[in-house]
Amino acid sequence: MKKYTIFLLAFALLLALAACGAAPESPGSAEGEYSFTDDLGRTVTLDRPERVAALIGSYADVWCLAGGRDTLAAAANDAWTSFDLGLDDSVANLGAIKEPSLETLLSAEPDFVLASCNTAANLELMDVLESAGIPTAYFDVQGFEDYLNMLDICTALTGERENYQTYGLDVQSEIESAVARADGSAPTVLVIRATGVSCKVKGSEDNVLGEMLAALGCVNIADSDSSLLEDLSLEAIIKAEPDYIFAVLQGSDPTDAMATLEQTLLTNPGWGELQAVREGRFYTLEHELYNLKPNARWGEAYEKLADILYPQK
């Protein structure tokens, strides 16, 4: 099956290259080539791009923040469903993140592709894109510093360096101000991610909200009880008695996720016995800020958590 898939990809590539063979080459940047190392350790060299494809919506958002909106030629479907980018019909929709359309991607004639290290479908396209001579950068954006690094590279490519200050360094200052509000009390927290089909407890790593809470001086109860990550146990939660409980409702429409959360936890009589619930310290949080990478809104996300954890008097 894998050989058949590779054959189809190669065949599609040959067709696309044949169709584009007579097209004039894009002129190079007056400033010359720009080189950087991506998060896979690959050296990427290119002129200022004129047609950019983003294989996940978050990276389309970063490219637009970097001043590249007018050069965005293609993006994954979540650029429309999860990010309010206001893209017009000139931007090709590549389809789902996990199943991008190679035909649509090549038809968009990108001269630069933004891809994710953590998405198998993106990694599978590497050889095809390299064979086509299309510069491709792979990024691994987990936390704010990773976002800042990507924004730095993207603003260098667009030439809009002032956007690095506005959407990067200024946001960093907002985060630092929020983190400085931590008073050393080290509140214990429970983090839950609810979808339309499941509820899972998350630790301090590999998720946006968990990492933010750790930076704000919180102690995640799942970090010391890894069994919670595998099996959501109300008994274990009651035993730990967290000071705060945060639930992220995944999806642009939280209705199904909220129904799952209610069915799994909220309707259980034991849930109402938790002190955090009784005293109003159970919060449902926005998907856009605490599940997706918030990008330019990272500072806002930190500030909202600081307002809950360390309210200013």
Predicted regions and their residues:
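Bacterial N-terminal signal peptides that target proteins for export
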Residues: M1-L8
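Bacterial Sec-exported substrate-binding components of ABC uptake systems
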Residues: Y4, A19-D61, R161-I192, L249, ...
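Bacterial N-terminal signal peptides
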Residues: L8-A18
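A short, structured surface patch at a secondary-structure boundary
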Residues: A54-A108, F112-N118
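Alpha-helical, coiled-coil/dimerization segments enriched in small aliphatic residues
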Residues: A79-T81, V201-E230
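Proline-aspartate-enriched helix->loop->beta-strand connector
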Residues: S101-A115, I134, L234-A247
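Extracytoplasmic ligand-binding site segments that recognize negatively charged/polar headgroups
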Residues: A121-E124, F139-I153, A186-V208
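Structured C-terminal subdomain patch of bacterial secreted/periplasmic proteins
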Residues: L148-A156, E162-Q165, Y244-K313
